[in-house]
């Protein structure tokens, strides 16, 4: 399913890229698809594989038809490391600009992992006019920025889950728990990154506060943290019936134990 979606997205973006780049794309031996993201993390690694599978399928059929000429696709990836602990946004932006300048991709897919990097990187995408199909970063901040200047950011698209919709899903889950078990005391633990802060804050504001839940605490954790014992002890001591975790880092799996 994901491969078919990526395949369709690539074909669509090739059309857009051809319209934008024109003769420059046609003169190349192959059409370069850039994949700048956090390759060391599951989401980035699997997304990169999906792009490779999709392009292999396209190339096996002869490539894509560009003005009557069949052209093969070439995938070029770079590890932005923006999801890794301690990596500043400017460092990730250097990687994004480097792949554009050195590899000259006709289009970019997947894109930055962390929302902070995506929002800041939108200006780089706009500067070089490279169409980008983002599939990971979730903060609604990128949409707000696009709406502020749609002409400037018209090359940027996002197909993944928006944190706003995740709020609705989580609120629905909490409502079900309340209905089925009568629980109404929650302890919130979230990663200290844009999408997770927004998600935790909006669930509290839009659901917990209105539905009469008692929020016993909200703890934010830097990316890479693996010790959650202090908050768990607080949650137990205060009588929490539900813990709502909002993370994307692999270390959060420790909470299951």
Report each predicted region and the residues it spans.
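Beta-alpha junction/loop-to-helix N-cap segments that form part of ligand/metal-binding clefts
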Residues: 28, 43-49, 64-147, 159, ...
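Extracellular/periplasmic bilobed ligand-binding domains
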Residues: 120-129, 200-257
């Amino acid at each position: 399913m994901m491969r078919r979606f990526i395949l369709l997205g690539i074909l669509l973006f090739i059309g857009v890229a051809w319209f934008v780049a024109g003769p420059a794309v046609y003169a190349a031996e192959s059409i370069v698809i850039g994949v700048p993201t956090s390759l060391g993390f599951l989401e980035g690694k699997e997304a990169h594989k999906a792009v490779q599978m999709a392009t292999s399928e396209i190339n096996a059929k002869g490539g894509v038809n560009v003005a009557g000429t069949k052209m093969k696709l070439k995938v070029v990836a770079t590890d932005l490391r923006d999801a890794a602990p301690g990596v500043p946004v400017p460092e990730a932006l250097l990687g994004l600009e480097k792949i554009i300048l050195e590899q000259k991709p006709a289009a970019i897919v997947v894109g930055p992992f962390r929302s902070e990097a995506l929002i800041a990187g939108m200006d780089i995408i706009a500067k070089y006019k490279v169409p980008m199909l983002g599939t990971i970063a979730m903060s609604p901040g990128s949409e707000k920025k696009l709406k502020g200047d749609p002409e400037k950011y018209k090359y940027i698209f996002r197909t993944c889950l928006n944190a706003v919709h995740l709020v609705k899903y989580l609120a629905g889950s909490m409502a079900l728990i309340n209905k089925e078990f009568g629980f109404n005391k929650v302890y919130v633990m979230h990663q200290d990154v844009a999408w997770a802060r927004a998600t935790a804050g909006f669930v509290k504001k839009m659901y917990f506060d209105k539905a009469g839940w008692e929020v016993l605490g909200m703890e934010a954790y830097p990316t890479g943290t693996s010790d959650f014992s202090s908050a768990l002890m607080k949650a137990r001591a205060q009588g929490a019936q539900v813990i709502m975790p909002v993370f994307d880092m692999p270390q959060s799996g420790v909470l299951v134990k």
